[in-house]
Amino acid sequence: MKNEYIKIRGAKEHNLKDVSLDIPRDKLVVLTGLSGSGKSSLAFDTIYAEGQRRYMESLSSYARMFLGQVEKPDVESIEGLSPAISIDQKSTNRNPRSTVGTVTEIYDYMRLLYARVGIPHCPKCGKAIHKQSIDQMVDRVMLLPEKTKFQILAPIVKGKKGRHEKVLASAKKSGYVRVIIDGNVYELSEDIELDKNIKHSIDIVIDRLVIKEGIERRLTDSLEAALGLGEGYANIDVIDKEIIKFSQNFACPDCGISIDEVEPRTFSFNNPFGACPDCVGLGYTMEFDEELMIPDKSLSINEGAIIAMGWQSCNDKKSFTNAVLRGLCEKFDFDLDTPFEKYPKKIQDIILYGTDKEINVSYESQRGKGIYPVVFEGLIKNVERRYKETYSDSAKAEYEQFMRIKSCKSCGGKRLKKEALAVTLGDKNIYDATDMSTLKFRKFIDELELDEMQKAIGSLILKEIRARVSFLIDVGLDYLSLSRNTGTLSGGEAQRIRLATQIGSGLQGVAYILDEPSIGLHQRDNDKLLATLKHLRDIGNSVIVVEHDEDTMMEADYIVDIGPGAGEHGGRVIATGTAKEIMENENSITGKYLSGKIKIEVPRERRKPSGFIKVKGAAHNNLKNINVDFPLGIMTCVTGVSGSGKSSLVNEILYKALAKKLNKSNLIAGKYKTIEGLEQLDKIIAIDQSPIGRTPRSNPATYTGVFDMIRDLFASTVDAKAKGYTKGRFSFNVKGGRCESCSGDGIIKIEMHFLPDVYVPCEVCGGKRYNRETLDVKYKGKSIYDILEMTVEEALEFFKHIPTIQRKIQTLYDVGLSYIKLGQPSTQLSGGEAQRIKLATELSKRGTGKTIYILDEPTTGLHFADVHKLVDILRRLCDSGNTVIVIEHNLDVIKTADYIIDIGPEGGDGGGTVVAAGTPEEIVKVENSYTGKYVKKYLEV
């Protein structure tokens, strides 16, 4: 009999307190609760991990070696579990070669469609290409100058791995003498051994001729032989010049250009046969930029204008680079004390790009003084050469600070060879088709006019493409293009793409586990997402969603509320049942927010701005050359549907432009004309959800700076002074006080061949990171390790008599992080937790009141109660005179904002304009504002 429930017994993973519960199968189930309450521990670290582990167990040990293995979660038993698929937000592919089209496999079908029914054109003149006859080939060769030497080649292997022994033996048996392998000539009488793991290209030399009268007959016979062996292909190798390619398939009669047979790989930018050779299919190149090498052109060279790698000392008169520049001065009559921007264009170009004229460099080294004739290659070419010549990764990283990503000049950012871009369907090449928004792309596919032959070949391919594109549109991604790089997607967008891919797979009997799929989604598009989740459920799957969105909870079949608090105060099942049952449960904080018993209040009055930052002519991505006024001294929410242009405006233009001018950063802002009002600010800070550190050595105590104070405190104890210990003794990052057996990590990594690496506590220090002598130093009976193991709540009580330390810890408590340990490794913190640690750090600083804070969807991962705290914190930042700008979809945050800038009205091409700007009360009166429509009911309550 089929289990109706997933029966979990004795789950103790992380902070779960021996949780036992029954989750109904084949239903839409929401797991909710405060941040850190244990939702993810139950959903991902218990249910998903066990489902994955059981699947892995069914595979051979050989297969498991390649896949890695999931550890058994700390749970007594789980019954009724299906194979589990996790769709979280952390597994976004950051590979620059990965696009929306490739991850959804739509691009694979597009490559097949263009290869089978696309119409090839001449890359030079644009005419449609047809098959070539042998007579046309002979006529083309005879146009070469008289006495030109050439050889006729039969291409028999094109970029394929293997030893190709049979191919070479067959050529030898047929009486041929020579072959060209990977550009090198070999005699077939030799023993030719090829590396089977490398791709090879092999041409048989059919004949060698010289252009003169009367060779047409022999040329025709040789071409026929070459075409026969080369399956319709023949190459003419004009000695020391060009290779002319001939094909019985495609050739331009006017230009004489032949192209290879069109195959799916012709359209792959990840394959050398399709990729643009200059950018190798990336669509961009890295180039040294004069703006980064000479960031402040108001300085002279002697004042340090040039900061490029290898040229930092060019203002030192003892350096060789300075001697070279002095030689330039003598030759071209300028001096090194003039501001760089005051030099004529000609002099600037000579410094940057060099000169072919010889200059005399007078230089005194340890070996004596001399005059050296030098041809100056220019600053940019010099640094380029050094970059190419170095083998050091650290040196390359240093050079790359002065490089900027620029669209490839050869392909215009389209990634493909010109031959691939010359194949069209419906008057569009494959790049133009995939560069449209998915909504326009579906219209293009639906309106394609094909002849009967093309329909017969392409109908099945088009059916697959339509289905997959429709799923993307259904999850609210109608504004994305298939050519969009996945590295530029938000966590929510990446998750919804994977969700669309899963719907396309049509699997049944699976447990899908999702992590806040509503992130980054405007309320308008929530219905589409819910319909998608219900569709997955209706075809016979269990859909378990970790979610805080009110609409999703109200539509769920079953809710599990975990809490009551976070960390040690959480890990229990507080309430289960339908939304109605949760609302009636007195113990459930979630229920109280859903029923309106507790709510985030609308402010009685909105703050008035103290001034404005005026952005004019914003035209980055889809922004339509707009002017936007950002009010200062208050909290502003930038709203709009997904893809409307919020991030382009706030993150790409406002933040990067202000960071460059206020923080002196090297960031490159998006396209805009001017920004006014900068004199009212002194710095800009982006508080995002990126980790506070990349290694376990980074933790909340080190990030907030409170650990420095704690180390000072320990160094001032009687014990420490008696032993001569300084503050550095209590650091686990440097030798002295740390345990040297584990280098202060507290854990040792043991490599297991057929199993995942195992981390075990260090035997010497017992996982305490410090040596015995350091741990013997106590403050109020606690060692430095004991302090790091304290939760924020415990530390607040422990340090209550030391105001400087207590103030910093208090801000961590205020942002809702009472449950995390001071020494909790940064790798164990969620994005939301990392963001709140950054907020706490800012709150603990004594501000100037002239700071502008940028936050992008800070409510990610936050429960209603956490959002309540967040709103209070953001308003506290404004109380000090600071400016807060938040990109947000959460209506509880939007309704508490002093000012709203609504971008839209739609996503992609249909967005990019300011729909409305003003207080929430003013926004609700604007008819075409989707945000106004949804926030209205929140203001009326």
Residue ranges, per PLM feature:
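Conserved phosphate-binding elements of NTP-dependent enzyme cores
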Residues: 1-941
